[in-house]
Structures are given as structure tokens and as C-alpha cells.
Swiss-Prot record:
Name listed for the protein in its UniProt record: tRNA dimethylallyltransferase
Highest taxon in the source lineage: Bacteria
Role according to the record: Catalyzes the transfer of a dimethylallyl group onto the adenine at position 37 in tRNAs that read codons beginning with uridine, leading to the formation of N6-(dimethylallyl)adenosine (i(6)A).
GO biological process, one term: tRNA modification
Assembly and interaction partners: Monomer.
The organism of origin for this protein: Xanthomonas oryzae pv. oryzae (strain PXO99A)
EC code: 2.5.1.75
Binding-site positions, substrate: 16-21
Top EC class, one word: transferase
């Protein structure tokens, strides 16, 4: 199908706390859209406050997809996401509505928009072994090991990104080939829609840091720690030998809350650790987004008129986009 005849979709990308949720809701109301979540934390039931999951009122106003797909003791892969998202997008297009992809999980976006390389499946035993090594030598030490066996991947993966270090070493150990080899293979089927990629990101780092801090404080006031206590109390979670290895618990904020509730440090120390971890996540997200050469960048507060023109130019005119909040 020629590119100019494919159905339209927009991808609202950006670091955490940059305003994607608010803009997605506005765009859905204005252009008769439905929102497809591209967030690896929002797929888990019970992760509400700490994941900034759209509330009941938002979900009643605009249809949302790919929320609450798994329980927190389960695993959900990028390949599963790509298949589920492709199906949701096809259904949205069939209804004559606009698919709005909104989130900040780079692996999910790449899997959907570019296709996945043929990576080996996850291996629980290999992951457990790598996690045990991290307890002994630290993730920086494992990053050094990765640099020896796969310098290409090590150059892309930061030493403070344990999840990607673990996955890269896991792939190497179970397949005998570096993850960069698998990632260089031709990707799978690409998405048959024409997508405008929009990146929301404050130009000043201090602005984003302030939004992150204010959002965490709001989450704490809303009962974030009580939410984590509820997840911890689930019988299936109590049966997990190492819950910190679960993707749901590794989500930023949840991991630090889990460790705090295990007795690690004071409440103030937990808050500082959660803010720092969220800043590191935002930094990694911005690094990934800079590689999206066909994306249009906008400051969520300063570039409202430019953003308006970009969306209208791609989708057609409707009433003006309102000022986005910091969700």
C-alpha cells in the first residue's frame, strides 16, 4: 500500500513526566481517537498510582488499550506488546478512528514501529545467575564484562541500566552470540500506518527534574506506598523467591518503594532514591529519543503553537489544543 494512502496514527513520545498523557487525551477528543498505551508498567494490574495509570474518568472519556494485561507476578514481552498493539490499532482504524500511541517505553515503540530482531526468548535461570553476580560485583562490573563480549552493545547501554545489561548478557550466554548480532538481523513486519512521531520534552533539564519531583510527591500523597503494600501482600507475590527480579517490581519507583518497605533506609532516603532513579530513566529515554531522527520535538509548555501546527498539518484542523498539564 503506498505510504500516502496508509491510515494515519500519531506517536506521542517523551521522557517520563513530560505531558504525554494530557496531550493524548486532548488529541483523542479533538480528532476522534483512541489511546494505545506504550508503557511497560501500565500493562500490570495493581500498578496504578506509581505508574501514573489513567484513572477511571480518563478511561471513560476516551477508550484506552493495553492497560491491565498481566498480573504483577507475570512477564509481558515486547513481542507480545507488538502483536497486541498491532491488533488494537487495526481495530481502531476499522472503526474509523485515530490510533494515538502514547508512552515512553522505547523497546515497545521500536518493536511496534520498526519490528523486532530475532532475539532469543528470556531464560529465567540465566537471569537469576546474572542477578546473583550483580550482588557480588555490581552492575558496573557486569557492564565491563559486557564490554568484553559485546563492545557494540556496551557502547549503547549505560552502566546504570541493569535491565538492559542483564538482557544483553543473558542473550550472549544462552545463544553464544552477542545481542548486537541478533539486533542487526533484518526486522520483522512493520506497522502499516503512517505515523507522525511527536516528542514532548522540556528544553531545560531543571524543568523536567522539577516535574518529576512534584509528581512523585503527588503520588506519595495519593497513597503510593499503600499501593505497593497491597501488591506485596498478594499470595502470588509472596510466593516469588526474588520479587525484585520481576519486571513489574523493577519499574522505576516501585523498586525503590519495595526496598524501602523491606527496611532499606528512611522515607526521605526512599524519596531521594526514587527521584534519582526517575531522573536516570528520563535521561535514558532522551538518549533513545535523540536517535528517532524522523521525530518532531516540542517543549510541552513553550511550543504549543508549533505543536498545534504540526498536528493540524498531519491530521487536519479542529478546535485548538488546550494547554497540557504535567502528567
Amino acid at each position: 500500500m503506498p505510504a500516502d494512502q496508509r491510515p494515519l496514527a500519531i506517536a506521542l513520545m517523551g521522557p517520563t513526566a513530560s505531558g504525554k498523557t494530557a496531550l493524548a487525551l486532548e488529541a483523542a477528543e479533538r480528532w476522534n481517537g483512541e489511546i494505545v498505551s506504550v508503557d511497560s508498567a501500565l500493562v500490570y494490574r495493581g500498578l496504578e498510582i506509581g505508574a501514573a495509570k489513567p484513572d477511571a474518568a480518563m478511561r471513560a472519556a476516551v477508550p484506552h488499550h493495553l492497560l491491565d494485561l498481566r498480573d504483577p507476578w507475570q512477564v509481558y514481552s515486547a513481542a507480545e506488546f507488538a502483536g497486541d498493539a498491532r491488533q488494537a490499532i487495526a481495530q481502531i482504524v476499522a472503526r474509523g478512528k485515530l490510533p494515538i500511541l502514547a508512552g515512553g517505553t522505547g523497546l515497545y515503540f521500536r518493536a511496534l514501529l520498526e519490528g523486532l530482531s530475532h532475539l532469543p526468548e528470556a531464560d529465567r535461570a540465566a537471569r537469576a545467575s546474572i542477578a546473583a553476580e550483580a550482588e557480588q560485583i555490581g552492575w558496573a562490573g557486569l557492564h565491563s564484562e559486557l564490554a568484553r563480549v559485546d563492545p557494540v552493545a556496551a557502547a549503547r547501554i549505560h552502566a546504570t541500566d541493569p535491565q538492559r545489561i542483564q538482557r544483553a548478557l543473558e542473550v550472549y550466554r544462552i545463544s553464544g552470540r552477542p545481542i548486537s548480532y541478533w539486533q542487526a538481523l533484518p526486522p520483522g513486519l512493520r506497522l502499516p500506518v503512517r505515523v507522525l512521531k511527536v516528542v514532548l520534552a522540556p528544553r531545560e533539564r531543571a524543568v523536567l527534574h522539577g516535574r518529576i519531583e512534584r509528581r512523585l510527591d503527588a503520588m506519595l500523597a495519593q497513597g503510593f506506598l499503600a499501593e505497593v503494600e497491597q501488591v506485596r501482600a498478594l499470595p502470588q507475590m509472596r510466593a516469588v523467591a526474588v520479587p525484585l527480579d520481576l519486571p513489574a517490581v523493577r519499574a522505576v519507583g516501585y523498586r525503590q518503594a519495595w526496598e524501602y518497605l523491606d527496611g532499606a533506609g528512611s522515607l526521605a532516603e526512599f524519596r531521594d532514591k526514587a527521584i534519582q532513579a526517575t531522573r536516570q530513566l528520563a535521561k535514558r529515554q532522551l538518549t533513545w529519543l535523540r536517535g528517532e531522527l524522523d521525530a518532531r520535538w516540542f517543549d510541552p509548555e513553550r511550543d504549543r503553537h508549533q505543536l498545534e501546527r504540526a498536528l493540524v498539518g498531519f491530521l487536519g484542523d479542529r478546535s485548538a489544543v488546550r494547554q497540557a498539564s504535567g502528567v
